[in-house]
Amino acid sequence: MSATQNYGTGRRKTATARVFLRPGTGNISINNRPLDTFFGRETARMVVRQPLELTESTEKFDIYVTVAGGGVSGQAGAIRHGITRALMEYDETLRGALRRAGYVTRDAREVERKKVGLRKARKRPQYSKR
């Protein structure tokens, strides 16, 4: 492995992403597939690119990601979080801008568990007064 790389772990819902930043031309590969083939939805691709566009480093780095768990939205969020952490490891002065954009904070929202006697987490069976 090259010494000129930066690493960041990102998490969102049940997805975990390991992100490696290396100097390059702007290639993003996720689980050995290009970004455009890995994510079919444009919104997911946009979420992944957000920290790079904010720091104006879209063409500076090649990004290698391994992501597991969760769905499309959770994986995109986890990759964004991992890229943010790797960028901060690369240059600590980027932290302020990334923090203001809200990319540094781990989104702690998780699915609420289903309760016994209820149809879903909070949905109750219909109540009959008589």
Curated annotation (Swiss-Prot):
The keyword Cell inner membrane does not apply. One of its GO terms (cellular component) is cytosolic small ribosomal subunit. It comes from the Bacteria. It holds the Pfam family Ribosomal_S9. GO terms for molecular function: RNA binding; structural constituent of ribosome. Keywords: Ribonucleoprotein, Ribosomal protein. Belongs to the universal ribosomal protein uS9 family. This is Small ribosomal subunit protein uS9. PANTHER family: RIBOSOMAL PROTEIN S9, SMALL RIBOSOMAL SUBUNIT PROTEIN US9M. Disulfide bonds: none annotated. GO terms for biological process: translation.
